[in-house]
Amino acid sequence: MSDKIGLYSGSFDPVTNGHMDIIARASQLFDHLYIGVFFNPEKKGFFDLETRINVLKEALVDYPNISVVSAADSLAVDLAKSLGVTHMVRGLRNPTDFEYESNLEFFNNRLDPSIDTIYFIAHNLMQPISSSRVKELIHFNSSIEGLVPQSVIKQLESMNESNQNL
C-alpha cells in the first residue's frame, strides 16, 4: 500500500493554535504531512513569507512526519501534485468556511481528480480563533497568549526589540 501524504496549505499569517490543532490531528492520519505556506493576495500580510515558514518550523519541531514547504507563486493543488500528495487537508470553523472550502475543493478536483480533500472540524474552543483576529489584537497591543504557539510570541518579541534598538 502506498504512503498517505497530506498537504495542509494556508497563509498562516500568523499561525494560530487553531491551525496547530488541525496539524496535530492530521499528522496522526498521514505517513507524511506537508504544511504549505502560501501568499494570499486577498489578505494583507503581517509576517513575510520567510518569517512565517521559520515560525511554523519552530512550532512543529516535535513532529517528525511534518515538513514545511512554500510555493508562493503557484496553486496548492500544483504543489500537491509535485509532492505526490494523496489528500488535501482543510480546517472548518463555521458554515462560511465550509462554503469557501467546498468551492476550492471543486476546482482542485477539476485540476487533479486523484487528490482527495479531508475536512477537519475545529474543536469548539478553537472555532473563534483566526489569524485576522490575532492580527487585530496585536495591532492594539492586546495579549495573544493561548491563541498562538510560543514561536509567534517569540517572533513578535524579537521584532519589538529590534524596533526599540533603532
UniProtKB/Swiss-Prot annotation:
ATP binds at S11, F12, H19, G91, L92, R93, E101, M126, Q127, P128, I129, S130, S131, S132. It comes from Streptococcus uberis (strain ATCC BAA-854 / 0140J). The keyword Hydrolase does not apply. Pathway: Cofactor biosynthesis; coenzyme A biosynthesis; CoA from (R)-pantothenate: step 4/5. This is Phosphopantetheine adenylyltransferase. The keyword Plastid does not apply. It is found in: Cytoplasm. Keywords: ATP-binding, Coenzyme A biosynthesis, Cytoplasm, Magnesium, Nucleotide-binding, Nucleotidyltransferase, Transferase. Pfam families: CTP_transf_like. One of its GO terms (cellular component) is cytoplasm. Its EC number is 2.7.7.3. It catalyses: (R)-4'-phosphopantetheine + ATP + H(+) = 3'-dephospho-CoA + diphosphate. Belongs to the bacterial CoaD family. It comes from the Bacteria.
